Amino acid sequence: MTKTIVVKIGTSSLTQAETGQLALSTIATLAETLCHLRSQGHRVILVSSGAVGVGCARLGLTERPRAIALKQAVAAVGQGRLIRIYDDLFTTLQQAIAQVLLTRSDLVQRSRYLNAYNTFQELLGLGVIPIVNENDTVAIDELKFGDNDTLSALVASLIEADWLFLLTDVDRLYSADPRSVPDARPIALVSSIKELAELQIGSQGSQWGTGGMVTKISAARIAIAAGVRTVITQGRFPQNIEKIIQGELIGTHFEPQPEPTSARKRWIAYGLLPAGKLYLDEGAIAAISLAGKSLLAAGIKLVEGEFDTQDAVQLCDSNGNEIARGLVNYNSNDLQKIRGCHSREISTILGYAGAETVIHRDNLVLI
């Protein structure tokens, strides 16, 4: 049966830790593995980091740049070299590829989000392997994915993939960082994202990359909400991807939600960037999380941030824990005036007849 497979490989797997030079044998094995998956009829997308790391090596830089302008310039140098290497390898294997560079704004605007979906579908229909990266050269800090783990999960969600593989520099998820805690417990299967709540996760990435295990768990949360089975496994052995698809329990598997969130609600939850926060009382939290109700003004205790009507906001409990996201029917100024008030009082307070709900349940998604 044809599957749609997204594979993300990080900088730490693509490069040699000591020198920052490309690990060509790993890249070649990855290319062969992806081509073999294609020959079996599967649809494949590769999300590849490495532009900045490769750019550093090409320019003789010994440390990853911190200044934004320099980092973007280095990414421009590295991306060209990286895609040329991929093209040479895949051409030898007679496999067409495409370069797809995305920014967060491509997924924030609904029309561009849908256009990205259509483009991926056309490429996959043509038998092409899209190679995706963040467009670091033009991305601004406020509209960055932050890491390619998040990008790969959003792509997997966008195209409703069957599998997401996060290839990293450890063989699986552990209860603590195995590089510093020798007795860290390996985790083979996560049947619910809630199981991770009390785990101590190493959040420091390698020198050449930006993503630690925390970002991979966040990515898994996005993917499993879309019904995508997610696996964290070692990047040095790309051939394990086929073994995993065939049923071997290698790495850490995150089971997908049995009832995936709708595409539109996934866009609200993960495609949009929240512009503010609403802190709710216990009654409102119970109403939206347990009863599937809309959010009313009466349940809002505090409004944080400046936002307009139909912006995305985070819904939080009194401790600041996020429980949901949604699109608001009022701007922040009006919400400051009506928070804690009954819906029938809104027209008197604001001087116009607004919506009965602050966030309608159709525009609200639990996190």
UniProtKB/Swiss-Prot annotation:
Entry binding sites for ATP: 8, 168-169, 210-216
CC annotations in GO: cytosol
E.C. designation(s): 2.7.2.11
Gene (UniProt): proB
Residue ranges that the Swiss-Prot or TrEMBL entry lists as coiled coil: none
Subcellular location: Cytoplasm
The protein's name: Glutamate 5-kinase
Gene3D superfamilies the UniProt entry points to: Acetylglutamate kinase-like, PUA domain
Function: Catalyzes the transfer of a phosphate group to glutamate to form L-glutamate 5-phosphate.
